[in-house]
Curated annotation (Swiss-Prot):
The species this protein was found in: Rippkaea orientalis (strain PCC 8801 / RF-1) (Cyanothece sp. (strain PCC 8801))
The reaction(s) this protein catalyses: cytidine(1402) in 16S rRNA + S-adenosyl-L-methionine = N(4)-methylcytidine(1402) in 16S rRNA + S-adenosyl-L-homocysteine + H(+)
Residues engaged in binding S-adenosyl-L-methionine: G50, G51, H52, D69, F97, D113, Q120
GO CC, alphabetical: cytoplasm
Enzyme Commission (EC) number: 2.1.1.199
Record-level GO BP terms: rRNA base methylation
Cell location: Cytoplasm
Record-given protein name: Ribosomal RNA small subunit methyltransferase H
Protein family membership: Belongs to the methyltransferase superfamily. RsmH family.
InterPro entries reported for this sequence: RsmH, SAM-dep_MeTrfase_MraW_recog, SAM-dependent_MTases_sf
């Protein structure tokens, strides 16, 4: 397999999935925060189906976008959704945003929405959701080898417990890992979710927050190396900004938000613009419940 650092900017070849539609969160706040300028070149590091990119391209007719995603289905969907705004204004790069070979002062602004796209949750075969029966997959880049099934069925009890605690912040990590090892192998998401539910008192098994929520988060983070990728990306991305350019990162859980907060604060390239993160207005939360945990942080590259 070719190293993703060597991948050229691509023309998407995979046909778009008509149902790959994702509602971007904090859209207006993000666009306002980036302060889009005429003729600007922007990096959408997690393009998804293209929601944020569409708003950026709509601001001025000469704005350009370089769009990244690990998911080939997302790249195809974004290319289709954004084509009417001018394909010559768009370049796509498939891979991990931490591996993008950016250049010093290449971009007027950078946006990354770290949430899992709604279609990834809603397509059972992707294995991200415990609410739909599917294989234990969870790969954003489906060319990689490690899956959630491999972790669940092959890792030791101690390794699983540590994973659930560190990446899921799950207080019952030890008992859950022990039960999983006793009951494995698991083939489907719903099998695993039901096994996890059996480790908590009956009154907590089917409440508003499913007992498997944090375990599934931990597995997804591990499969996709999400936190280490975010750290590597934030170590590089500020240098890719032009002086006065801005970077906005939307996170969805405390582990991500903590990394963004301290990477922004400690960067010698950036001035933090958001002392506290921006969160969705109540109206947006009601329209899109998945936006409830979103947090936007913004920073600006120093002028000199």
């Amino acid at each position: 397999m070719t190293n993703s650092c060597d991948r050229p900017l691509i023309t998407p070849l995979e046909p778009p999935n008509a149902s790959f539609i994702h509602i971007s969160v904090l859209s207006q706040e993000t666009i306002a925060g980036l302060n889009i300028i005429p003729g600007g070149h922007y990096l959408d590091a997690t393009v998804g189906s293209g929601g944020h990119s569409r708003l950026i391209l709509a601001t001025f007719p000469d704005v350009r976008i370089t769009a990244i995603d690990r998911d080939s289905q997302a790249i195809a969907a974004a290319a289709s959704n954004l084509a009417e705004l001018g394909s010559e204004r768009l370049k796509f790069w498939q891979g991990n945003f931490a591996d993008y070979p950016g250049k010093i002062a290449e971009f007027s602004g950078i946006i990354a929405d770290l949430g899992v796209s709604s279609p990834q949750f809603d397509f059972p075969e992707r294995g991200f959701s415990f609410r739909h029966e599917g294989a234990l997959d969870m790969r954003m880049d489906q060319t990689q080898s490690l899956t959630a099934g491999e972790i669940i069925n092959q890792w030791s009890e101690t390794a699983l417990a540590d994973l659930f605690y560190q990446y899921g912040e799950e207080r019952r990590s030890r008992s859950m890992a022990k039960h999983i090892v006793q009951q494995r192998p698991f083939k489907t998401t719903t099998q695993l979710a039901e096994a996890i539910a059996q480790t908590v008192p009956p009154k907590y098994r089917y409440g508003r927050i499913h007992p498997a929520t944090r375990v599934f988060q931990a597995l997804r983070i591990a499969v996709n190396e999400e936190l280490s990728s975010l750290e590597r990306f934030l170590d590089q991305a500020p240098q890719w900004l032009q002086p006065g350019g801005r970077i906005g990162i939307i996170s969805f859980h405390s582990l991500e938000d903590r990394i963004v907060k301290y990477r922004f604060r400690d960067s010698s390239w950036l001035t933090v613009m958001t002392k506290k993160p921006i969160i969705p207005q109540r109206e947006e939360q009601l329209k899109n419940p998945r936006s409830r945990s979103a947090k936007l942080r913004l920073a600006e590259r120093h002028l000199v």
